Amino acid sequence: VHKMKRFSSIVVSMAVVMSTVFAADPTDTHYNISECQGSLRPYPVNVVPVQYPDSLIPVHINHVGRHGARYPSSAANCLALRTALSRADSLGTITSLGRDLMKLNEHVIAQSTDRWGALDSLGMAEQRGIASRMLANYLPLFTDGTIDAISSYSPRAMMSMYCFVHQLDRLNNKLEFITSTGRVNSPLMRPFDVDKDYIEFRKEGTWKPPYDEYFSGHCPTSAIERVLGGSFPYGDVQAKRELAMAEYYVIAGMSAMSVSCDPLKFFTEAEYNALWSCFNLRQYLQRTASTLSTVPADIAGALVLDIINTTDAAVQGTNPAVVNLRFGHAETIMPLASLLHL
């Protein structure tokens, strides 16, 4: 009898373990609130100082950066949310939480009008901070010499560049600066605009079927129901999911424009992680190398070659600049990191 009980206990334990293993969802993540902002996240505040041995002397810097924190890149998500919330209000389905979101969304619209996509005060401070730390960490390069800086034509990238070099100039006005901005820099800073293979890749939409499959299975709609109400006429389930993503985009982007908002007021941790995963997968499939195609990463080839050439020239003493600065976008960094296997 005792042996039978022991055997039964072992079988039950094994069954529990096996059910746990098979029930585990590999896409179930537990990132914190800040991490779930993805590329909408501002630069981290806590920065570890860079140190190098006394035996080494910095000889050249090649810098590729994203623009600083900004207002929402367009009004699309805010306006989609406004339309849905206003309709829910008129139909009487809106919840008290929905009214809170309506006020918050209207505040974002008011703050962003005529500034959509522009660098904000936080973004300017981020660039000044990076510039200050760079000069302090690699002071031998900043006693004199030339700083060469380029940016994409985007106003937020351009302003990031000027905030950066302006701070360097304030710290040492003996430095010389050469700056360049505009579409002339698109092959390096916005290759996704000009690379024919990539444009064709996006047009063909090979990334879309796997994304749509994931999106339909993992995008939660419970959060949007809590603001619009269960009886709100969402239309089809796809439209409901798109509204859920619009809510995510608006809330996840608020810290970049210094608007105070606790996402956990509107999402559970699991919902926020799931919505982020949809946002993240879309970027992964569109902006990096995957089993679908290497084209999204290959577009960074010209930038990699430019980094190599300017570094080689610095080593050979033929690069007039002691520092090369480049200011682009998250969509500039993702292909670059992918191509370099970072």
Name every feature range the model reports, one short phrase each.
Residues V1-P26:
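Bacterial Sec-dependent N-terminal signal peptides
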Residues A24-D148, S152-V323, G328-L342:
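Signature for phosphate-centric chemistry
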